[in-house]
Amino acid sequence: MNRYYSVIGSVVFKKKKKDSDVSVLGFLPSSDAARECKAILDIVDSAFPNGMSEGVGEDCKLQEMFHKALELLPKLWVQEGLIDEAVNSYRRALVKPWNLDAKRLASMQKDLAIALLFAGVEVDLSPRFKIWCSTPPKNNMEEAILLLFVLMWKIQQGEIEWDSEVMDHLTFALTVVGEFESLADNVEQILPGVKTRAERWYFLALCYSAAGQNETALNLLRKVSGSSEAEHEPHIPSLLLGAKLCSQDPCKSREGISFARRAIDSTMNQNKHLLSQARKFLGVCYGNAAKISVSDSERNSYQTQSLNSLTQAAMLCKEDAETVFSLGLEYATQRNLTPAFDNALRYSEMTSGSTAKGWKLLALIVSAEQRFSDAEAIVDLALDETGQIDQLQFLKLKAVLQIARQHPNQAMETYRILLAMIQAQRQSGMDHEVLSDTKLEVEAWLDLARIYIDQDSWPDAQVCIDKAKSIDIYLPQSWHTTGALFEAQERYKEALVAFSFSLSIDPDYVPSIVSTAELLMKMASSQAFPIARSLLMNALRIEPTCHDAWFSLGKLSKMEGSAQQAADFFQAAHELKLSAPVQSFV
């Protein structure tokens, strides 16, 4: 045993003398030193098969040398590039009780977690380690997360001191596996004083927003900017995150404007990048506010401020592709197609055509210019450049463009391919993708139904509608298409019931509002004209660029004998139709 003691003594001496260089330990190469350390561990392990009992005193020389060997062996294997040996050495040190003090044990647990996370290899858990686990971890990532959970628990219990690296590694691991709520739980358990309240709330808001709980995240961000934090400096990241989350929901656009304005006031003359981001979110929120505005003057004001803010953001940070995209989208929404196309093209160049939304915006802008053939060519390019999941939405867009080009048979074939791909994904067990593609599947069946309605093939149309309803019966689109089928069959009362059912699901569904008004104009006497006009005005309040609503309003005015007003409405409908994309920009 004296030989092994001298070896480990040499290792410890060299480690203390030059900690940053472990390539040479004592008079032995690291590989030889590792083998000597392993020999010591084997001897002690055979002597204590169930671990070292607490009866061995802390001053025992064997225990201290053994602990040094436990610590150094995995580091020596890492130096040799033998990651699997290093991981198994860590596991060997941790799987049995060896009387390691709390600090040393925690250090080895953290080192093993780091090795499992960042080594780049999957080191299987050998059977000799599994017998010590009631439920062994499934993979290295799960094992690392469990170790980090243990370390966080020890920190909370006061067994070891706060270590920011543990939280950093746990954040990385849980983010990779998408367990954001679990990450939030661990952040909430951090002891007071480690982070400020603003930092804690911001971190939690990030977790909940990543988990899809935007309302919970916003509630936390409201605390950061609330009266309780008024005496502190504004927390700019929280203001920016609040503006970003609000920009994703038109109903929260005004709150987003408030977040963004406060961020701008706080970053003025400080950080050009943060100021650019704040102005970008401000512009997007202004654009969203315009969509839900009731008055024309307010809508026009918001649209102007949206373009101004986005233009300023683009000038501040010219390399920010997302700002360019937002500017192009806002121009497109306002039907200003030339600058919309320029910005969409610039965005595609900046991202090297790697994003689906860039291709989609470009194709829709070209379709709004009534260049359907060119738009379809862009979609074909997108199908070659994007992944399988994004290809589904482009197949749908391709079919819609083929319908616009009066090629219904080609569109039907494209829809057949789309539905087959969705079915293949479902059978392959890609649950997340199948869930996200349910909407596409319903839309495909309903578009097919409309093709059959136009061809007076009503039984086939009914089959397609039934398919859509079997997926989700509570969709306004399904009942609207049902109404369109009844209307084509001149079953007007049944059509009116179907449109009414659609509006009972979504009172703001514009196609059903317009169709209901059209039916009232067909079915009823002049006494129903005020109701029809009210419906059409409501449709235009919701969607001012709906050319169908303007056209129906023109027909109604003509029926009422207002020729000049009808002409104005027809002119508006014509101009809007000439700049209408085949489907909504957003």
Residue locations for each model-derived region?
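Conserved structural position within tetratricopeptide repeats
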Residues: 42, 95, 153, 192, ...
